[in-house]
Amino acid sequence: MSKFKVVTPKGASFTVAGSDYSYEREALDPIDAEIIEAPANEAEFIAAAKNADAIYAKGIPITKTIIDALESCKVITLGSVGVDSVDIKAATARGIPVTNIPDTFIEEVADHAMMLLLSGFRRLVEQDKMVRTGRWSDRKSVV
């Protein structure tokens, strides 16, 4: 029996462990799956993904053309909140489920938004420049 084949576009990666897919391997190693990085242009991606069991979609749109070329795909998965980069109608027509991670990075995004609000309100960038140029005593005009 051949290995379960996961094809993903080369380049963009959501993994924080580098490009070795350490986190993905935790889930895929028990089923003896292989991850194959394919070129990101559509024609070459199709050639590499034609016999894939799964597509890990990232970095390129997964179009109807790509989906229609998949001969044995069982799932298209995204490591993101949205699924707008995948032609859902085409995948549904082929009976291929599309999955995502609806709560990925939500705490980090909320933290970042609050940090930006506070830094804007307190004029953090402007005050940082003043401190670095020795103009700390001018801070009252900023606050």
Briefly describe each language-model feature range.
Residues R94-I96, P102-V143:
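Phosphate-binding beta-alpha-beta segment of Rossmann-like dinucleotide-binding domains, i.e.
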Residues A43-F45, P61-I66:
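Short acidic active-site motifs
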Residues A52, L70-C73:
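An anion/phosphate-binding loop that grips the pyrophosphate of nucleotide cofactors and donors
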Residues M1-A52:
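N-terminal glycine-/charge-rich "phosphate-binding" loop or analogous flexible N-terminal tail
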Residues E34-A40, A57-G59, V131-S141:
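Short gly/ser/thr-rich secondary-structure transition/capping motifs
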Residues A12-S13, S80-V83, D103-I106:
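Short, acidic/turn-prone active-site loops that include or flank metal/cofactor-
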Residues D84-I96:
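Rossmann-fold NAD(P)-binding glycine/threonine-rich loop
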